[in-house]
């Protein structure tokens, strides 16, 4: 069966950037990577506990003792809390986990319907509230298309509707060009914990092409270019002699060379006839 590569990893440094930005000695790589995992896990656990939508967590390190955590959310005021109470709690929690100074920043998502992770989180929450998955997916699809999304695909997998056998259900509208690297594809994944088991939710959004087609507008012109009639006629008249042989340089020296070659062949033929 065909498998799909993650749209982010395929487009790194084309129209996507790394979610962890740091560079240290390779001996420290595993330790810092584990710290990044702890920071993301504890932050998501805390914010999900107070029921806030989080799209992404970006980690930036300039030195070993200071970590900057950027949280993307459509409701920054709620995440910050009253006088920054929630940020202070998150900072204290992460400091205990990684024993480093934590600087937390909030990034607002102005258009939540254009964020695949936010859409996936919303669908997962409604599935946990026993909403009909068919109506839910179709309504989410229509609402995203009405906002200006060029393409959307939603797929849910698991024991849908309490069925004994797990299956998948998918809806799609518009274009999702996964093989086009210049396409701005947003991807989100969430899990709905129902009484029948876990249901996975995947969302793909196509927001348009970031790199214009005019950049590669001349691609293929050399292959598809056909010689003009003037060039063909000039080649036929000037580059082929009377006996159908190609002339590399149409000058006096070349013509004399061809005439000498033809005379030598005729002399050799006449000599063989006389010997017979």
From Swiss-Prot:
| Transmembrane spans | none
Q: Which cellular component appears as one GO term in the record?
A: cytosolic small ribosomal subunit
Does this entry carry the keyword RNA-binding? yes
Its keywords, alphabetically, are: Ribonucleoprotein, Ribosomal protein, RNA-binding, rRNA-binding
Annotated KH type-2 domain ranges read 39-110
Renumbered to this chain, the signal peptide range is none
Record-linked PROSITE patterns: KH_TYPE_2, RIBOSOMAL_S3
Question: Looking at the keywords, is Ribonucleoprotein present?
Answer: yes
Give any GO molecular function from the UniProt entry.
rRNA binding
List, in alphabetical order, the GO biological process terms annotated in this UniProt record.
translation
- Entry's family note: Belongs to the universal ribosomal protein uS3 family.
Q: Which PANTHER family match?
A: 30S/40S RIBOSOMAL PROTEIN S3 (PTHR11760), SMALL RIBOSOMAL SUBUNIT PROTEIN US3C (PTHR11760:SF19)
**Assembly with partners or alone:** Part of the 30S ribosomal subunit. Forms a tight complex with proteins S10 and S14.
Functional description taken from the UniProt entry: Binds the lower part of the 30S subunit head. Binds mRNA in the 70S ribosome, positioning it for translation.
Instruction: Please report the name of this protein according to its UniProt entry.
Output: Small ribosomal subunit protein uS3
The record lists the lineage as: Bacteria, Pseudomonadati, Spirochaetota, Spirochaetia, Spirochaetales
């Amino acid at each position: 069966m065909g498998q799909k590569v993650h749209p982010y990893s395929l487009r790194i440094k084309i129209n996507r950037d790394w979610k962890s930005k740091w560079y240290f000695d390779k001996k420290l790589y595993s330790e810092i990577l584990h710290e990044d995992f702890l920071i993301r896990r504890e932050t998501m656990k805390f914010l999900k506990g107070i029921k806030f939508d989080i799209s992404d967590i970006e980690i930036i390190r300039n030195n070993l003792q200071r970590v900057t955590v950027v949280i993307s959310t459509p409701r920054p005021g709620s995440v910050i809390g009253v006088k920054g109470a929630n940020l202070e709690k998150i900072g204290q929690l992460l400091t205990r986990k990684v024993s480093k100074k934590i600087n937390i920043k909030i990034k607002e998502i102005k258009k939540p319907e254009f964020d695949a992770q936010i859409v996936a989180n919303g669908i997962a929450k409604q599935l946990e509230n026993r909403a009909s998955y068919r109506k839910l997916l179709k309504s989410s699809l229509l609402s995203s298309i009405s906002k200006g999304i060029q393409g959307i695909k939603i797929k849910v997998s698991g024991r849908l509707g309490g069925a004994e056998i797990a299956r998948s259900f998918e809806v799609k509208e518009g274009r999702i060009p996964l093989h086009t690297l210049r396409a701005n594809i947003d991807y989100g994944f969430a899990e709905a914990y129902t009484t029948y088991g876990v249901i996975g939710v995947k969302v793909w959004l196509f927001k348009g092409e970031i790199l214009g087609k005019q950049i590669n507008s001349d691609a293929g012109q050399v292959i598809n270019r056909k010689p003009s009639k003037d060039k063909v006629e000039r080649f036929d008249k000037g580059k082929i002699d009377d006996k159908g042989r190609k002339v590399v340089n149409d000058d006096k020296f070349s013509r004399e060379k061809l005439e000498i070659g033809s005379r030598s062949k005729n002399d050799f033929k006449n000599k063989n006839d006389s010997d017979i």
